[in-house]
Amino acid sequence: MPQGLALYCFIAAGGATGACLRYFVTTSVDSLFGKHMPFGTLTVNVVGSFALALLYGVIERYDLSDSPYRALIGVGLLGAFTTFSTFSVETLTLLENELWLKAAANVFLNVGACLLAGWLAIELMKG
């Protein structure tokens, strides 16, 4: 595994890629489904949860704990791709607009779907 500056460069490269992917996915999903519900954020969080659980399964299965992929993909790319802060602000905005059902649905969909996606990835890795 890279150390020092090289490790931070791996994380930064993954983070830049993940941020650009998040922007692309959220704007694409929002343009398809509209902005009445934050489906773009839900999409990146669910896909990211699945991908991170899958990555950790691959790392464990193939004993890649010293691999730079954990930093590049897990911390950098998927860390920037998923977004808990945006989920929080979007939920608060729904609450401020007194859209109680949409706010509750956003919380339950994000938490439930992300947990389900992670579980599915883990089960796939058990194979």
Curated annotation (Swiss-Prot):
Name recorded for this polypeptide: Fluoride-specific ion channel FluC
Alphabetic keyword roster: Cell inner membrane, Cell membrane, Ion channel, Ion transport, Membrane, Metal-binding, Sodium, Transmembrane, Transmembrane helix, Transport
Pfam families: CRCB (PF02537)
Transmembrane portions of the chain: 1-21, 39-59, 72-92, 105-125
InterPro entries, per database record: FluC (IPR003691)
Catalyzed reaction equations: fluoride(in) = fluoride(out)
Principal subcellular localisation of the protein: membrane
Record-stated family: Belongs to the fluoride channel Fluc/FEX (TC 1.A.43) family.
Originating organism: Alteromonas mediterranea (strain DSM 17117 / CIP 110805 / LMG 28347 / Deep ecotype)
Location in the cell: Cell inner membrane
Membrane topology note: Multi-pass membrane protein
Any single biological process term in GO: cellular detoxification of fluoride
GO molecular function: fluoride channel activity; metal ion binding
Activity regulation remarks: Na(+) is not transported, but it plays an essential structural role and its presence is essential for fluoride channel function.
UniProt function note: Fluoride-specific ion channel. Important for reducing fluoride concentration in the cell, thus reducing its toxicity.
Residues annotated for Na(+) binding in this entry: G79, T82
